[in-house]
């Protein structure tokens, strides 16, 4: 799962060290300053949820994207109050709407830069922005898997040498990470539902797979024992005008902050 991959990255792949001490301290800086760039897609939402609910948290978490709709949705799912209850100060920034994104982001750290920065889109400007907002001993995690074998970006090697900047990549989580995320989900601390935006049945599966790059939103949850066209959760209310079952699903999801839930699933399995 995306959350288990985040678990692997933030506990075991990212690392820090001290001058003169040749030992890596694995994981993000506990109580440090973290940024997740281009992180309001399904993969990023899973990471935000993990960062706010795991045992090793930053004190500052900054989320960026250039899609205002996705950014707004993320801020509704992970409110300032929600983060504060977990000991984290959270900010959401649309980097397309500020004159100087690098300065804007660095200012949120008090000018020190970030200890840990993760990139959730394989896009050169985002990678280079991540490099520019790193602080001393900053770790840049290139989480997004690229499809272009020639993807490259500028990286400041002066800062590598003198400021101990370093770079890691993610290859996903392992069985232990999956176990941790299942445990957190079972305890109610991690909610995978934040990544789900559509539901469908077996009859919708082929078209959904073939057209996946063209379908907006996050994860598509398919119920193979049901015949059901692919439907966005946000469209339940409209479909409910002609189908009482979707009217009820709209009511249930509203009660769960617009998210899919066990209650919604139970209703679907019993009524579709």
What are these regions (language model features)?
Residues 1-6, 10:
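Single conserved hydrophobic/aromatic residue that forms the stacking wall/gate
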Residues 14, 21, 99-104, 128-132, ...:
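C-terminal hydrophobic helical "lid"/dimerization subdomain
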Residues 20-34:
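Short helix-loop-beta connector
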Residues 43:
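Hydrophobic/small residue at the entry helix of a nucleotide-binding pocket
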Residues 54, 132-136:
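Conserved helix-to-beta-strand junction in the class I
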